[in-house]
Amino acid sequence: MSLPPLTLYLAAPRGFCAGVDRAIKIVEMALEKWGAPVYVRHEIVHNKYVVDGLRAKGAVFVKELDDCPDDRPVIFSAHGVPKAVPAEATRREMVYVDATCPLVSKVHIEAERHHAGGLQMVMIGHAGHPETVGTMGQLPDGEVILVETVADVATITPRDPDKLAFITQTTLSVDDTADIVAALQARFPAIVGPHKEDICYATTNRQGAVKAMAPKADAMLVIGAPNSSNSKRLVEVGRSAGCAYAQLVQRAEDIDWRALEGISSIGITAGASAPEVLVNEVIEAFRTRFDLTVEQVETAQENVEFKVPRVLREPAGA
């Protein structure tokens, strides 16, 4: 029996970004240097496959520093941590490595700079997301006002409307954030913004590729974790760019094949913490059911790389 034809559009860029790549390397190098167990505060990146792989090598994932012994190394996740966390690790004389993405650290520095200049911060982000918690935790309580939607902008009550600056989570929807920024600027004309957009290159590029791919595809799958902010945004971007059926799947076994009956094209992308091995697994699952033609939809090229901290580049005992 011949298989039905299907065009599979593959978004590029997709998958791992430089910050995720660096964070995973940090855990692997820490295990090489210090042996197991190495403790990691929160999931190093939001992807079950990656976390399970590191756990098998000897990484122990915990919620808080209280769950770590004093005498084993601890790594802080790529999302960033409140200032109180490294301060506590230092007090306990722990060996720690900060795997915060450098582009998240840039937002932290920005927040501190504006705070030092007497400005109150408005953060555009998702409540409870580790990155938002970490960024807001760079400043004293009450110094950062969280805004999640355009509607929130109308309800906030800053100390002084003329002394405000805004920052954003790095993994937001580019379009939604632009709407919130416009609302902030309309209500608070004096508000100061970042020199360069806080939403990172990888988030922007992956959303750009989805926008180019979505109108061509009958359906779209985003490979990513349900707790991955940037992956969930890719689903939303796909839907708003004209693809009626856009779904998040962790891996091939999650695909709802009945929902895909009768399609002649599908778009595939992956969130910034999803490894390429899971993309290949999904493509192979389609290959067993369809006569597949794969077309890459490339909208940008990436060559960003971040160095790991010096402590991991030095031999043990150095």
Curated annotation (Swiss-Prot):
Pathways involved: Isoprenoid biosynthesis; dimethylallyl diphosphate biosynthesis; dimethylallyl diphosphate from (2E)-4-hydroxy-3-methylbutenyl diphosphate: step 1/1; Isoprenoid biosynthesis; isopentenyl diphosphate biosynthesis via DXP pathway; isopentenyl diphosphate from 1-deoxy-D-xylulose 5-phosphate: step 6/6
Reaction(s) catalysed by this chain's protein: isopentenyl diphosphate + 2 oxidized [2Fe-2S]-[ferredoxin] + H2O = (2E)-4-hydroxy-3-methylbut-2-enyl diphosphate + 2 reduced [2Fe-2S]-[ferredoxin] + 2 H(+); dimethylallyl diphosphate + 2 oxidized [2Fe-2S]-[ferredoxin] + H2O = (2E)-4-hydroxy-3-methylbut-2-enyl diphosphate + 2 reduced [2Fe-2S]-[ferredoxin] + 2 H(+)
Positions annotated to bind (2E)-4-hydroxy-3-methylbut-2-enyl diphosphate: H46, H79, H129, T170, S228, S229, N230, S273
Record-listed E.C. numbers: 1.17.7.4
Superkingdom of origin: Bacteria
InterPro entries membership: LytB/IspH
Gene3D superfamilies: 3.40.50.11270, 4-hydroxy-3-methylbut-2-enyl diphosphate reductase, catalytic domain
Binding site for [4Fe-4S] cluster: C17, C101, C200
Record-listed isopentenyl diphosphate binding positions: H46, H79, H129, S228, S229, N230, S273
Signal peptide: none
Cofactor note: Binds 1 [4Fe-4S] cluster per subunit.
Residues binding dimethylallyl diphosphate: H46, H79, H129, S228, S229, N230, S273
Protein purpose: Catalyzes the conversion of 1-hydroxy-2-methyl-2-(E)-butenyl 4-diphosphate (HMBPP) into a mixture of isopentenyl diphosphate (IPP) and dimethylallyl diphosphate (DMAPP). Acts in the terminal step of the DOXP/MEP pathway for isoprenoid precursor biosynthesis.
Similarity comment: Belongs to the IspH family.
HAMAP family named in the record: IspH
Protein name: 4-hydroxy-3-methylbut-2-enyl diphosphate reductase
Taxonomic source organism: Dinoroseobacter shibae (strain DSM 16493 / NCIMB 14021 / DFL 12)
